[in-house]
Amino acid sequence: MERAAEDVKIYFVTIPAHKFLHIKNYESIGYWDFWQKQSLIPGQDCQTICSLLNGIQGKLDDMGESEPNSGSGQIMAYINEPTGRICSWGIPLAECYGVRLSMDYDGEVPEQMLLIDVPEAEYIVFEHGPFDYESQNSSVEEAMEAAMKNFDFSKTGYCLDLSPGRIFYFYHDPKRFWKYIRPVKKVM
């Protein structure tokens, strides 16, 4: 397995208020398990959902790609959810798949999807640049996990925000990046 060639960049951002159109699963553990579980729910299999999301106009992250990934505006997300499964970080969450939309979005909401308002908030970004999916995906994932695990918040004035409802985005587009965007809050 080839090692990831680039380091993980870490920075803070403020993301403006937006909407998130998505499906949600309280039991899945990762992307493949998410779609396996969703395939058991009528109308929520990967092909159906990705096709519906491709038809949504005004996706904030759409780079014009045709593949159902971050390049076409489709992303995984995790919502802090007290009734969700406990993830490897010890945080109860629900896994989601969907698209970010502007706050003034007033278009279609497919019946099997949820549309929520996400307020403006601060986030920490862990980002790895372009990589070869076949030879580097595993090593990039390891580098990203290590960067998040080892990040020292003590000198930043922030900590992870584990409040119910806060959302954590995951962008996977090997041509551009692997990016985790996690909610933070100021330390009092």
Regions found by a protein language model. Give the residues of each.
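A solvent-exposed interaction/effector surface
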Residues: 1-188
